[in-house]
Amino acid sequence: MKKLWSVIILLFLTSFLVISFSGCDQLKISNLKANKHFKLANKYFTDEKFKKAIGEYEEALKLNPDLKAAFYYLGSCYVSVYKPGDDSEKNKEFGTKATLYLQKALEQSPDNKDIIQSLGDINDKMRNFDQAEKYYLQIQKFTPNDPASYYNLAGFYSNNRKYDKAIEMYEKRIALDPADAEGYLYLAGFYQDNRKWDEAIKNHEIRIQKIDENATMEEKAKAEFLADAYYRLGVVCWNKSYQTPADVMASVERLQVVQKGHDALTKATELSPNFPDPWAYLSLLFRQKTIAEPLKKAQYDKEAEKMVQKFQELRKRKLATEQFMKDLSKEK
C-alpha cells in the first residue's frame, strides 16, 4: 500500500514539475518573441516608419505586458502619426492612444522630461489647452533658469492666442538676466509678429543698448551683434511705415519713422560694410518717403535705385566668396 502511495505521489510531483517547466518555457519563449518584436519596432522607430513600429510595439506588449520600455516609444509613435485638425475617428484614436501610453510611461518615470514634453505636445496638438499647459509648466519647473523653457511656453501661449501670458513668459526670461540682450530680441520679435510696431521698436532699441553696454564682449563680435541689432530695428521701422496706410499715419510721423529706420540701417552698414541686406531696406525706405513727400518722388526713386545697386553688388560679392570657400573645402 505504501508503495502504491509512493508511486502516486511521484507521478503527481512529476506531472507538476512538467507543467511548471512547461509554463516557464512558455513564458521564456513569449518574452523572447516580445523582445524580437521590440527590437524590430525600435528599428522602424529610428527609420521614422512609425505605423510599422506601432504594430511591432503592440505585438511585443501582447506577448509581454511587463515590457514597460515600450510604453514611451509606442506613445511617441502615436504622437507622430496624429494629424492636428483631422477630426476623423481614426485620428482621434491615435491621439487617445498616444496619451494613454505616454501616461503609462510617466507612471514608470515621473520625472522624465522627454515624456512630459511629449504629453504637452500631444495635448497641444489635440487642442487640450489646460492639459498641455499643465505639462509644459512642469517642464519649466525642471529648468527654471533655462531661457529656452520660457521661450517654449511663450510660443505655446502665443499660438493659443494667450498673448498676455506669452508676454509674461518673455518678461520672466528677461528677468533672469536683464543685461542679456537676447531676451529683448525675442520679445521684439513677438511684438513684430503681432504688428505692435512701437513695442517692437522699443525692445530693439533696448537690445542695442544692452549690447553696447556689454564690457566683456570682444569688439569684433560686438560690432557684428550691433550691426544685426540696428538692421532689425531698421526693418521694423520700414514695416511700421509700409503696413500703415496714408490715411492712418500722418506725413510728419511717417518721415520720423522712416528717418529712424534710415539711421539704424546706415549704422548697420558702417558696423558691417559687407552686410548686403541693410541696403535693400534702405531702398525700400526711400520708397516710403515718397508717400509722405510725393513731390520728391523722382529724387527718392533715384536714391532708392542707388541702394539697390549697392545691395546687388555686395550680394554678388558675398555669393562669390561663399562659392570660393566651398570650392576650397572640396580641394582639402
Where in the sequence are the language-model features?
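Short coil turns that delineate tetratricopeptide repeat
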Residues: 31, 65, 110, 144, ...
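Alpha-helical segment of the N-proximal tetratricopeptide repeat
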Residues: 32-59, 63, 121, 125
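Canonical positions in the second alpha-helix
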Residues: 59-60, 104-105, 138-139, 172-173, ...
